[in-house]
Amino acid sequence: MADRDKNDIRKRLEELRKDNNRRNNRQDNGNRSPFSGFLFFIFVILLFTFTLLFHRDIQTYFQEKREISYTEFVSKTQKGDFSEINEKDDKLISQVKENGKDVLYYTKKITDRVGDEPNIISAIGQKKVKLNSLQPSGGGFFLLLLGQFLPMIIMIGLMVYLAKKMVGGSQGGGPGNIFGFGKSRVNKIDKKPDVKFDDVAGVDGAKEELREVVDFLKNPEKYTKAGARVPKGVLLLGRPGTGKTLLAKAVAGESGASFFSISGSEFVEMFVGVGASRVRDLFEKAKESSPSIIFIDEIDAIGRRRSVGKNSGSNDEREQTLNQLLVEMDGFETDTKVIVLAATNREDVLDPALLRAGRFDRRVTVDAPDLQGRIAILKVHSRNKKLARDVKLEDIAKITPGFVGADLANLLNEAAILAARRASDTIKMADLDEAVDKIGMGLGQKGKIIKPEEKKLLAYHEAGHAIMTELTPGADPVHKVTIIPRGDAGGFMMPLPEEKLVTTSRQMLAEIKVLFGGRAAEEIGLEDVSTGAYSDIKRATKVARAYVESVGMSKKLGPINFENSDDEYSFTPNKSDETVREIDLEIRKILTEEYFNTLNTLQDNWEKLEQVVELLLKKETITGDEVRRIIAGEKAEDILKGTEVKEESIQKGSEGIVQTSENSIEESQENKTVEAEVHDSNLKSDTEKLAEAVREITGETGGVLEPTEKNDFDKDSDDNEKNDDDNENSDDSSKNDSDSDDENENSDNKSEKNKKRKSNFKLPSFME
């Protein structure tokens, strides 16, 4: 055992030494600029030339200079201030020491030659001043010679440099190698990522599959003894954001193998043959560092199905890359510890040869998480965040069906941003609710001014959706209803979807009814319709088409699938023109029938719809519980009063006060109920019986409107008068009877209004 450990340690040290040398060479090639040596050589030549030609100018550049007039210059010469005068270009220059500093006096000549200026010549002769004539600026003949030969020198140096790089390019690639296109740009992860399998939640099935891959790399003997062969490739499938790349990072973090990461788009370049060369280079590096894992993200970039036909030549380069990948994966030996891990969300476009057994033996589907998976993901992403006590991640998971891991991480991040906007580091439940609405529907526009007519229309529209959601069997319950504009929507009704593996026919028809609820409510309540139902009608038509064309639930056409083929190269229609016409007629029939059923349901429950509209206009946002309370018979005014009492109690800041207030409200309601029961048992008035009957007719108890006859009301009125004669000696009974009469009159009026609305309503022309 000890010898075996020593051999493993020695082998591991040898691998580390090779990796270190390879890394150092790559760093040297990356840090060294391709033109660094040549540019340094040119820089030295230019610096020497500049110093040689302009050393006098450099010396005089830092001296103090004073330009004086020609007359003053002659005067100073006559006075003997100048001991030496230099003639250069068109200037006369003289250097004088003043107060310990060298001062340079100069003036322009008035003639081309200083010998033609008698004043200067006379002054120089009197004071015996030395006169010098300097070379013109610019270097003269040497600079002219250098200007002719310097370009040739530069060209020769560049050719020598490129020749050396060509020799080096045939031996290896890198940033400085002009022939390094064939080298793969793989990123070898030497430092293990911090991501572990415990950091990946909601995809337990996929984790178990990948744990076996990691275990094989750690304990290969356990599998080889049983005659098992390691999967040569593992393909991660799933919609975007489900955690495929995160699972690959977890594999890299858990396994002790070398991990190579590359994207599918990095194989193909502008030169022919580069992709295949990079595939070969990638697998060579992986074999040198085995046991190893190659992770190819977005493999559909190179693994797309090979085309056939005359126009297939445009994809030759990509197909060569794919062919080389197929050869490399099929060329593994059984004892080679190299596993290919790939991820894609487009399995349908992959080439069948890539998916066959022996290449990608195992396919791991990473689905969207269920309820428990979403709860686990939320817990993982909330580890580094402070959550308030009122936060319930289970409730957030319930209202986010279909959210994947990336969506849930973004949700918590948006909630944290909203908390920071409040200058707080604690996330509240309100922040999470706002984040859900923001991600699902867009940014809220609470400050937007809406006209009263539009606000009323929005209230009817959303109330229609809510009522139909609660009263339609098979529909999901309501979670929230709002008329606050958000994104492109003026308002929305958020359902609380249940986890479903399959969808029944009744559920699909229920979805159509719910979608039509908004338009039907507008048509009945406002006797007009708006463009707000555009998306609802579009979605309802899509559901109806799937009902007939895809899942074969139409009774007329039967269980037949009429969808077009997914093959992009198939142009043969799969149904006749007559069948297309029958499909369109069946879709229209379904939509018309469900719209008619929606109109009937809203007419029969119009009082409940009006109560929801009233509550929406006053609160703008209501919960699903409040909608269900209205359907159960509670009034909008009672709900508003209860909300106001609760808000006042919360503002006092005492939990005890809140509890006492709620208890007192409950006790008062219980007392009223007891008193009503005693009153009912003692008096048994026919008037109260009439009130109960009217409440049942108007739908306050959740029942459906039943047709009523005028004689029933006359009979109840006679019984009411008789009851008044029997109880005329009791003041309390008279008062209660009076209240009952008022209530009956109001209920009677509402019932008459409802019947009048039903009698006056006209069906749309397309339904007549």
Curated annotation (Swiss-Prot):
Its main location: membrane. InterPro entries: AAA+_ATPase, AAA_lid_3, ATP-dep_Zn_Metalloprotease, ATPase_AAA_core, ATPase_AAA_CS, FtsH, P-loop_NTPase, Pept_M41_FtsH_extracell. Residues 715-731 have a biased composition (Acidic residues). The gene is ftsH. It is a multi-pass membrane protein. It is an enzyme of class 3 (hydrolase). It is found in: Cell inner membrane. This is ATP-dependent zinc metalloprotease FtsH. The lineage of its organism: Bacteria, Fusobacteriati, Fusobacteriota, Fusobacteriia, Fusobacteriales. Pfam families: AAA (PF00004), AAA_lid_3 (PF17862), FtsH_ext (PF06480), Peptidase_M41 (PF01434). The active site is at residue 462. PANTHER family: AFG3 LIKE MATRIX AAA PEPTIDASE SUBUNIT 2, ISOFORM A, ATP-DEPENDENT PROTEASE.
